[in-house]
From Swiss-Prot:
It comes from Mycoplasma pneumoniae (strain ATCC 29342 / M129 / Subtype 1). This is Nicotinamide phosphoribosyltransferase. Pfam families: NAPRTase. Catalyzes the condensation of nicotinamide with 5-phosphoribosyl-1-pyrophosphate to yield nicotinamide mononucleotide, an intermediate in the biosynthesis of NAD. It catalyses: beta-nicotinamide D-ribonucleotide + diphosphate = 5-phospho-alpha-D-ribose 1-diphosphate + nicotinamide + H(+). GO terms for biological process: NAD biosynthetic process. Signal peptide: none annotated. The lineage of its organism: Bacteria, Bacillati, Mycoplasmatota, Mycoplasmoidales, Mycoplasmoidaceae. InterPro entries: Aldolase_TIM, N/Namide_PRibTrfase, Nicotinamide_PRibTrfase, Nicotinate_pribotase-like_C. One of its GO terms (molecular function) is nicotinamide phosphoribosyltransferase activity. Pathway: Cofactor biosynthesis; NAD(+) biosynthesis; nicotinamide D-ribonucleotide from 5-phospho-alpha-D-ribose 1-diphosphate and nicotinamide: step 1/1. Beta-nicotinamide D-ribonucleotide binds at residues 232, 309-311, 364-365, 403. SUPFAM superfamilies: Nicotinate/Quinolinate PRTase C-terminal domain-like (SSF51690). Belongs to the NAPRTase family.
Amino acid sequence: MVQTPSEINTHLKHLLACDAYKLSHRLMYPNDTTNLYSCLTARGGRGGFPNFVWNHEFAKKIILEVFGNFCDSVLAVQNDPGLAQALTDKVTTVFGDPQFGLEFTQHICYLANFLKQHHQLPLTVKIHQSSEGLAFRTPLVTITGSDQMVPELVWLVNYFETVLLENIWLYQTTLTVAQSLKLLLERYANETADNTEFTHFQCHDFSMRGMSSLQSALYVANAHLQYFSGSDTILGGVAAKSILASEHSVMCADGQEGELNTFKRLLEQFPNKNLSLVIDSYDMWHVLDNILPQLKDLVLQRQEKLYLRPDSGNFETLICQGKRFNPEDKTTWGVIDYLDYHFGSTVNQKGYKVLNQKLGIVYGDGITYERIEYILEQLKQRGFCSSNIVFGVGSTTYQNLNRDTLGFVYKLTAIKKGNTWHDVTKSPITDPTKQSIGGRFDNPNLIQVYG
């Protein structure tokens, strides 16, 4: 049976936003367990980053939202027999055990009585303050039982692992990736430009259509916008900026024979706005060498900048061919060479060429950190300033991230049996990189947000 997320009961989504095995763990801890202490951290992963970026406020909002929704749904189970039965049926179906399903629902009702008396979960949560350069294996979120904890509810400490990781790792990983892109752009700006202010707009978020869900797209856009000002994910942040831009459906509307008219019409229609036009719907080199020169006066009369966007081809040669360039051989020219030839450029204080201020390049086809670095290095070798190009960073970068990029994990680090705490450390002999940190953490950078 096919089921979309919107068809699932909202309360069940809040109650069961976890891996199935979490429901059984309340039965598995030692009988004398009176408390647990768990920690979310990034242990280092496959991204090759020396450190990572962490945002306290985002993690706090996620945790408080998850806890709030969970508590509301727990109370709803007690007040709605139909919902209680639906919960029992769902758990029974998953585990094939009616008694297990019934007992889980009864346990949720026990928690509801606790919430009515204490008005919050018996948990204390601390979150590390924000940082742009944290060391891996730093405790980021700690959760333990509060003074109100009772043995029957100890399982709650680890119950939220799945939903917290699911909602935290992508945003924080995107922050780290966006920071690395910003630092790369600033490096080339410092080498070739008169200032670095333009780098705030030099990576534009193109990722929404390639993300796995609207929620993922919003997390990525919001994180991207902590370092850049541009995103085409309109809902992704309160300060997202974009410009008017065409796509192939617009550029092909008049057919190839009417391509000159298409460019002319759009330039005349938007003379006072920043405008981005796709140039490779047919023959990009014809556009650069014939159509745009015919419209030169229209381009130069504009009040704002015209951005030209190639959307296909070999990234190694498309924008600039580096030292292969031969002014007498147009097969060695890239996009920037045609624009320089037909519209001119100036030389900045560092001796690098800056295209006519009415023109720029946008390139967003399969963009990665490595491709950006390659293109900027080629431009530098040819004597062009890095400000001549804006990159569209899409799902090739942001959808290729996963939890292992930075190694986000949530692990039990201490257990209290009776009145005594014991450190807990996972240390698999088959993979030393998965060794967990152990103990409880008295870190002044951990700020209490719940309990």
